[in-house]
């Protein structure tokens, strides 16, 4: 926006000064006084009271031009286009362009609307106020043009894992030039842009070099435009299609507890995922031929009635047009569980006592079974535990039997304790003393247990 005072008033003042200089002395004083009075009435640049504002509008929308007067004296207001053609003189429209419509006319404002703005309408528009001297102010209309077309192009519709591809995005015919941003999913990437100008319009092309991985399959690549004429997000996208070699995983589906023993059934399932999906999954035995009793059914490997000869490494292989992949499983067959005999009772009979000898059995069954990969160490530990338990049981039985024997002998000798005499002693001289001793012994018995004497 700018304002100016037309030079007609200054020219009049200058002409009056020249005339005063050429006049006679008496008249000269009067002319100078008149000149000073007239100069005080002439408006200067500081007294400019015509104003307007610049306008920015999006192509196809409506622009509003307003010529405003601060201190109106009912002077005429008119509006001119960039070619100095009169659009409105007061409330009259000489220009035959129906897109211009009068919104308001008064002594202090002339407001006009311009509909369906195009890039050709851009430029300076002039407001004029017919004062003495006339005043002029201009406004600039700037037209914003959003991108007419947004295109994204991928070098390859289908890429292979690890390959670098080129992605281009073009925003055509915008004003001013657009800013292009790249996203892969939610992650922003950096591209390289080139700007081409043609007839005050700009075409921007951005290039993105992208190395793809299998995780990028199905992820969108987004081209997003930022422009003052665009509200919200203007974007376009393409979904990546990435091919990758199979990923192989082996799962043991039987036995469920994870420990394989002789005589058990055994089953493995191979899972292979890739793009394109593997068409064939095969089983091989790495260190030997496949057992004859093994059954192969697609991704499943089944072996019935396991034995030690089945030990080895079994491999699942899968392939597609991208490549091959495999996974290994090491099988170790353990001995069958050891059967422990039930507890037994042994009875020994003597003359006066029955001795019962109990055999102590220690349970040697393992409380927890080892993992498949550590099964060999677990089996050796179980065998050692069985040997120690048997030895301990035998020692306990021997000690118990000896204790019982000592108790029996002690009780036997206690029952046969006493004084013994022979027949010869009975007829000897001291026999009377022996009888007396016996009588005294019988008469003086106070204990609960009877004391006896025997003569032989």
UniProtKB/Swiss-Prot annotation:
The signal peptide here is 1-47
**The entry's keywords:** Apoptosis, Cell adhesion, Cell membrane, Developmental protein, Differentiation, Disulfide bond, Glycoprotein, Immunity, Immunoglobulin domain, Membrane, Phosphoprotein, Repeat, Signal, Spermatogenesis, Synapse, Transmembrane, Transmembrane helix, Tumor suppressor
Q: Which cysteines are joined by disulfide bonds?
A: 67-127, 169-223, 270-316
Q: What does the record say about its membrane topology?
A: Single-pass type I membrane protein
Location in or out of the cell: Cell membrane; Synaptic cell membrane
User: What Gene3D superfamilies does this protein's entry cite?
Assistant: Immunoglobulins
Under InterPro entries, the record lists:
CD80_C2-set, Ig-like_dom, Ig-like_dom_sf, Ig-like_fold, Ig_sub, Ig_sub2, Ig_V-set, Neurexin-like
Residues in compartment: Cytoplasmic: 410-456
Ig-like V-type domain ranges (all copies): 48-142
- Tissue and organ distribution: Expressed dominantly in epithelial cells but not expressed in fibroblast cells (at protein level). Expressed in the T-cell area of lymph nodes, specifically in CD8+ and CD4- CD8- dendritic cells (at protein level). Expressed in CD8+ dendritic cells in the spleen (at protein level). Expressed in CD103+ dendritic cells in the small intestine lamina propria and mesenteric lymph nodes (at protein level). Expressed in brain, lung, kidney, testis, heart, spleen and liver, but not expressed in skeletal muscle.
* In-chain residues carrying the UniProt-annotated modification Phosphoserine: 448
The Ig-like C2-type domain is annotated at 147-241, 246-332
Q: Where are the transmembrane segments?
A: 389-409
Q: What GO CC annotations are associated with the protein?
A: axon; basolateral plasma membrane; cell body fiber; cell-cell junction; dendrite; glutamatergic synapse; plasma membrane; postsynaptic membrane
User: Any idea what a deletion of this gene does?
Assistant: Male mice are infertile, due to a defect at the spermatid stage of spermatogenesis, and show oligoasthenoteratozoospermia with almost no mature motile spermatozoa in the epididymis. Heterozygous males and females and homozygous null females are fertile and have no overt developmental defects. In the small intestine mucosa and under steady-state conditions, severe reduction in the number of intraepithelial CD4+ CD8+ T-cells and, partial reduction in the number of lamina propria and intraepithelial CD8+ and CD4+ T-cells.
Ranges in the Extracellular compartment?
48-388
Output the GO biological process annotations, alphabetical, semicolon-separated. Answer: apoptotic process; bone development; calcium-independent cell-cell adhesion via plasma membrane cell-adhesion molecules; cell adhesion; cell differentiation; cell recognition; detection of stimulus; heterophilic cell-cell adhesion via plasma membrane cell adhesion molecules
Q: What is known of its domains?
A: The cytoplasmic domain appears to play a critical role in proapoptosis and tumor suppressor activity in NSCLC.
* Assembly notes: Homodimer (via Ig-like V-type domain). Interacts with FARP1. Interacts (via Ig-like V-type domain) with CRTAM (via Ig-like V-type domain); the interaction competes with CRTAM homodimerization and CADM1 homodimerization. Interacts (via C-terminus) with EPB41L3/DAL1. The interaction with EPB41L3/DAL1 may act to anchor CADM1 to the actin cytoskeleton. Interacts (via C-terminus) with MPP2 (via PDZ domain). Interacts (via C-terminus) with MPP3 (via PDZ domain); this interaction connects CADM1 with DLG1. Interacts (via C-terminus) with PALS2 (via PDZ domain).
Q: Which family does it belong to?
A: Belongs to the nectin family.
What this protein is called in its record is: Cell adhesion molecule 1
According to the entry, what is the taxonomic lineage of the organism? Eukaryota, Metazoa, Chordata, Craniata, Vertebrata
In the UniProt record, what gene is named as encoding this protein?
Cadm1
